[in-house]
Amino acid sequence: MGEPILFLLILFIIGFIAKNQSLMIAVAILLIIKMVGMGEKWLPIVHEKGIHWGVTVITIAVLAPIATGEIGFRQLIASLQSLSAWIALLSGIFVALVAKGGVTLLATDPHMTAALVFGTIIAVSLFHGVAVGPLIGAGIAYMVMKVIEYF
């Protein structure tokens, strides 16, 4: 058994103990891809495009209430009359800009990926976090590095 499979099995066990279904499903899919001999073909594609696929799936989920008619222009206008909606709007803008920096950092400094992934694994498995951590984490790291460079 190679190191990648052992590492994935440990992550699966952590996901099981932490009752984190997302982590278990992700690890199971990667193990299946690897064990059926498709790893060399598919894993580089997943590595390269997976974040973009995930962002697309999340975007579809966020837009689904618009498609079902649950949210329309009336609800949008009504929601913007509250302070919390404006805070949510500004938070969405801020997080999107932070994530943009994360994409830049991961593309230009790939060795950061290991630390970011490990941090995400800890948050997902132990604290029931959501696995958007590497992108946001990289974005925050990018912002901090830019501030440090400035001084």
UniProtKB/Swiss-Prot annotation:
Pfam families: DUF441 (PF04284). Signal peptide: none annotated. The chain crosses the membrane at residues 5-25, 53-73, 86-106, 116-136. The keyword Transmembrane helix applies. It is a multi-pass membrane protein. The keyword Cell membrane applies. Keywords: Cell membrane, Membrane, Transmembrane, Transmembrane helix. PANTHER family: UPF0756 MEMBRANE PROTEIN YEAL. Belongs to the UPF0756 family. This is UPF0756 membrane protein GWCH70_2680. It comes from Geobacillus sp. (strain WCH70).
